[in-house]
Amino acid sequence: MAINRRTLLKSSALGTLSFAIPTLTLSQIDLGSATISTISDGAITLPGSLSFDSSMPASELEVILEDFDLSKDELTRECNLTLYQSGKKKVLFDAGAGVDFLSGMGTLVESLEAIDLSTDDITDVVFTHAHPDHIWGVLDDFDDLTFQNANYHIGRMEWDYWFDTETVNKVREDRIPMAVGAKRRLEALEGNINLFDSNDEIIDGIKALLTPGHSPGHMSFEVGK
């Protein structure tokens, strides 16, 4: 099937509709001796202006909205995290939104409990980037570290970007709280964080790949068996 903006948006809408009722553990697969789970951190509701392609003809968008009974004014999307378990390693990719970001998010702790894990069981937290829905969850509502026993890992470029004193001056005004919040949480991790570069194997079987754009130092990860 050819992938174009309509099929992509339609697939996105279907995924949102499928998980309209929050589910704590969405999927689980085995990869060799490892297990990879997709777990929920809740859902976020965004205005339609941020969710739908503004260049799409209105007639095309209307068909998709009608097919899936969606509003053009807003779209609710699931926020999910990945958990990699192999041997004694329990590696969480990103830390979720925590309690301070938006209503409806921050269900990660409950999702872990649903698979008989606690935050103390997490051995490593690996960040893709430092936007609020990916890193604010490192602190709990007492500003203590959520994952007390974990080692933390983030790309060097991403770390440097949020610690650059000019970043807060360069972002849009409405994104200043995001920049300040990212730096505050990264500061809480100083002394217990591993900075890595693209192509580094940061944990046995997990290789980092630089994929900038969404953020300057955004990382993706290749997971081996």
PLM region spans:
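Active-site neighborhood of phospho(di)ester-bond hydrolases with catalytic His/Asp-centered motifs
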Residues: 93-94, 124-130, 154-155, 210-213
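Secretory targeting signals
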Residues: 1-3, 7
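N-terminal export signals
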Residues: 7-26
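Short, glycine/acidic-enriched loop or turn micro-motifs at the edges of active sites
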Residues: 97, 132, 217
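Conserved beta-strand hairpin/beta-sheet module of binuclear metal-dependent hydrolase folds
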Residues: 28-115, 220-225
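Active-site-proximal loop/helix segments of hydrolase catalytic cores
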Residues: 209-225
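Active-site metal-binding motif and surrounding structural segment of the metallo-beta-lactamase
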Residues: 103-153
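Metallo-beta-lactamase
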Residues: 106, 113, 121, 148, ...
